């Protein structure tokens, strides 16, 4: 029963993610059954959030 360095060598054997059918990214989790990138398998809508992209500066400078 070891939980240290020897156990960490056994982590990379099984496949966690495969290529997604919808978005094509290597983000489809085999065990959970959904894509971490687009949300395929979890929802019909594509996973998108407002915080993914930087906001454009819309403030006008007062002179």
Swiss-Prot record:
Which sequence ranges does the entry mark as zinc finger (C4-type)? Answer: 20-38
- Supply the InterPro entries for this chain: Ribosomal_eL37, Ribosomal_eL37/eL43, Ribosomal_eL37_CS, Ribosomal_zn-bd
Q: Which Gene Ontology cellular-component terms appear in the entry? A: cytosolic large ribosomal subunit
Q: What is this protein called?
A: Large ribosomal subunit protein eL37
Family assignment from sequence similarity: Belongs to the eukaryotic ribosomal protein eL37 family.
Show which residues constitute the signal peptide. none
tRNA processing listed as a keyword: no
Write out the residues that bind Zn(2+): 20, 23, 35, 38
What this protein is reported to do is described as: Binds to the 23S rRNA.
Q: Which gene encodes it?
A: rpl37e
Which UniProt keywords are listed? Metal-binding, Ribonucleoprotein, Ribosomal protein, RNA-binding, rRNA-binding, Zinc, Zinc-finger
Q: Name one GO molecular function term.
A: structural constituent of ribosome
Organism equals: Thermofilum pendens (strain DSM 2475 / Hrk 5)
Asked if Ribosomal protein is a keyword of the record, the answer is yes
Q: Which cysteines are joined by disulfide bonds?
A: none
Which Pfam families does the UniProt record give?
A: Ribosomal_L37e
Name any cofactors this protein relies on: Zn(2+)
């Amino acid at each position: 029963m070891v939980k240290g360095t020897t156990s960490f060598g056994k982590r990379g054997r099984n496949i966690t993610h495969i290529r997604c059918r919808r978005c094509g990214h290597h983000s489809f989790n085999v065990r959970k059954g959904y894509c971490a990138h687009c949300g395929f398998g979890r929802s019909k809508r594509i996973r998108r959030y407002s915080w993914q992209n930087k906001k454009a500066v819309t403030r006008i400078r007062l002179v």
